[in-house]
Amino acid sequence: MLVRLLRVILLASMVFCADILQLSYSDDAKDAIPLGTFEIDSTSDGNVTVTTVNIQDVEVSGEYCLNAQIEGKLDMPCFSYMKLRTPLKYDLIVDVDEDNEVKQVSLSYDETNDAITATVRYPEAGPTAPVTKLKKKTKTYADKKASKNKDGSTAQFEEDEEVKEVSWFQKNWKMLLLGLLIYNFVAGSAKKQQQGGAGADQKTE
């Protein structure tokens, strides 16, 4: 009788384009034992419904593998290993993608349930970071060097940043000027000494 009923359900699902989810449990010593049958269908407004077709009257207590199968679409042997006990007060959570296709199922205990209750879980959109326009900055060579030396780490520059390069003459003009002054002073002193020595020689003659 049960086999005939399942055949009728499968035939009806093929006509109405609904999916039939078979939920079962098993251990190492026995074949899969049915827990329930659920019909998954898409509504005209784009949502997904899960209807309980049949819940098996079983007596179970212990740890088992849970299995889920949608013929031709989903095969999840031992998708969870958990402790089962009767009465079957569980939530059957059916996860679907953006195209309302079943991707996975899970089972969790809920003491408020009278039997296995199926619910649909849709994908949640993640948080969207606000778009921040980067400001354009101009840094001199000195700023870049100071940033690199700060805390002994390499500075990280913001995007769209321009570094103004300075020529060697612009960086070292003070040293050049100081060297030129020293050179003129030394050269002038040497010239005066030469002139003074030449005058003394003329007087001696």
UniProtKB/Swiss-Prot annotation:
This is Endoplasmic reticulum membrane protein complex subunit 10. Keywords: Endoplasmic reticulum, Glycoprotein, Membrane, Signal, Transmembrane, Transmembrane helix. Present with 1600 molecules/cell in log phase SD medium. Pfam families: ECM10. It is a single-pass type I membrane protein. It comes from the Eukaryota. The lineage of its organism: Eukaryota, Fungi, Dikarya, Ascomycota, Saccharomycotina. Glycans are attached at residue 47. The keyword Signal applies. Component of the ER membrane protein complex (EMC). GO terms for cellular component: EMC complex; endoplasmic reticulum. It comes from Saccharomyces cerevisiae (strain ATCC 204508 / S288c). It is found in: Endoplasmic reticulum membrane. Its main location: endoplasmic reticulum. Part of the endoplasmic reticulum membrane protein complex (EMC) that enables the energy-independent insertion into endoplasmic reticulum membranes of newly synthesized membrane proteins. Preferentially accommodates proteins with transmembrane domains that are weakly hydrophobic or contain destabilizing features such as charged and aromatic residues. Involved in the cotranslational insertion of multi-pass membrane proteins in which stop-transfer membrane-anchor sequences become ER membrane spanning helices. GO terms for biological process: protein insertion into ER membrane by stop-transfer membrane-anchor sequence. The chain crosses the membrane at residues 173-190.
